[in-house]
Amino acid sequence: MTTFNAKPDFSLFLQALSWEIDDQAGIEVRNDLLREVGRGMAGRLQPPLCNTIHQLQIELNALLGMINWGYVKLELLAEEQAMRIVHEDLPQVGSAGEPSGTWLAPVLEGLYGRWITSQPGAFGDYVVTRDVDAEDLNSVPTQTIILYMRTRSNSN
């Protein structure tokens, strides 16, 4: 009997799992679940404390490289009191997600949320908005853009 030392490929399993989660639980529950998965991943793979955005970007790219999950560019938006996170090359689970190929994007929201709130000077009360950048609506976006910003207080 011949044995091969190939790494298992979970892509078929993940694609079928993504369809079942979407069908059984719905998009909102799926997104909440995947955000929690992202937070859990961030707890196991933490960057050191960083004093600058540039240093944090380098450390996050090193962590993303370890799991082959693309790379990130961080930008502070002073007027909006926000951080713009542009993630490139998110792994795809087939065509799952809206838009197609972005099923894992909520994982990034949880991952970056936990990574960023662990840094000096970060605030814990934040909201995340996500957008995807696609030149052609029929193509798979190459970027996932996340804005991390302080929650506005209702009391003024």
From Swiss-Prot:
Pathway: Glycan metabolism; bacterial cellulose biosynthesis. The keyword DNA damage does not apply. Keywords: Cellulose biosynthesis. This is Cellulose synthase operon protein D. The keyword Repeat does not apply. It comes from the Bacteria. It holds the Pfam family Cellsynth_D. It comes from Komagataeibacter xylinus (Gluconacetobacter xylinus). The gene is bcsDI. May have a major role in the perfection of crystallization, involved either in the pore structure itself or in the organization of the pores within the linear array of terminal synthesizing complexes (TCs). GO terms for biological process: cellulose biosynthetic process. InterPro entries: BcsD_bac, Cellsynth_D_sf.
